[in-house]
Amino acid sequence: MLKPKKRERALFILTFFLALLSVSAVSVDRLKAHVMWLADSAREGRHAGTPGAAAAAEYISQQLKELGCDVQIQDFGGRRRNVVGRIGKAERYVLLGAHYDGQGPGMPSASDNAAGVAVILELLRELKGQELPVSLVALAFDDEEQGLNGSRYYVDHPLYPLDHAQAAIIFDTMGRQFMDLSSWTLFVLGAEYSKELASVVQMRARPEMLVIGTDLIGPRSDFAGFALKRVPYLFFTHATHKDYHGAGDTADRVNYTRLAQDSQLIAQIIQDIARLQSPPKYMDAPIYPPAETDALQHELDVVEKERKDLPQAYRIMFSDFRARLKTDNTRELRRIATSALLALATPRLSGFMVSFFLGPYYERENRRDIAAAIYEEALKWETEASERRALEEKIQALRTPTAK
């Protein structure tokens, strides 16, 4: 007979492998087929209100029907529509959501967010036969890119009562490495508002899954409306890359093997949530993940190691962040460090974030040398003559020694 400790370890291993087997393999081929269809040039970037977006909505509707869903189309004006599918008769449900609109002509919007839609379709296929005690609701939102309009409309006009939702699981910008780094990171946000969801996420934790608070990025995706309605939620993303909102966000650049692997993990998390004995509760006062600072330190280290072209302003900031995060646990510092990572990862937003967030922060901190270096970086992005002059004057003032 096994000794108690060995028996406990054997039981843990058996439980782990049974969990892995409880969901059949997510299909790489099906994920790829969905993304390639949605991101094809014939869809013209799926901008909300266009024929390309309408074709995408029809495609998603047909896929949901083939999966056995009861499908409804929710129009909210301007030729915009949400697609809603439900499987199951149970009153309570887990909601899987992703926006399907894109950036418009010339921008295929494959990772953002054809891949997110592909994930919910494939998860639905894999989970529908698992005899879950809850129903599954798939929500494909329109017009996210212009202000989260589809999801905001849905939470104000839900087709199924929001207080019956076990959780909302939202996907955005999937299938590409954050900042095109060699290592993969799956970011998980939202667990800080529910002890039950945090427990599930912690149980399924793995090194490349980084759990952080949503306040570090702000209301940047469709989880925001559900949070305002106090629906427990998790937001999954692989985050931004060099082609984000650009012509290079093509279907051939999505890593479907990794997308399938992470979808498999998420399927296990959804099963755990579905089988919770008590429904998750939304907490007004968030409990932030204890490993959040370590997650930020890790990303700062990896970026500085891999990005040989890292601008001097970012090297200075990252060095400052790494030193201060060891002793400074304030949310403001964590938000600013995250803003710096996002600015570097999103070239089209870099100038704005550098000028209006990072520079002013270091001015308030009276770190004049760092603020000057940041505004020098902003000059690289500014094309308006008057704005350039204002930046140059600000840099000169910051570089001028102050009287003691």
Where are these regions (language model features)?
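His/Asp/Glu-rich mid-to-C-terminal helical/loop segments that flank catalytic regions of hydrolases
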Residues: 242-292
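Alpha-helical metal-binding/catalytic segments enriched in His/Glu/Asp
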Residues: 85, 94-147, 266
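Acidic, Ser/Thr-rich low-complexity intrinsically disordered segments
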Residues: 280-344
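A non-catalytic alpha/beta surface segment that caps or lines the substrate-entry region
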Residues: 34-36, 45-88
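Metal-dependent peptidase/peptidase-like ectodomains
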Residues: 90, 132, 141-235, 255-256, ...
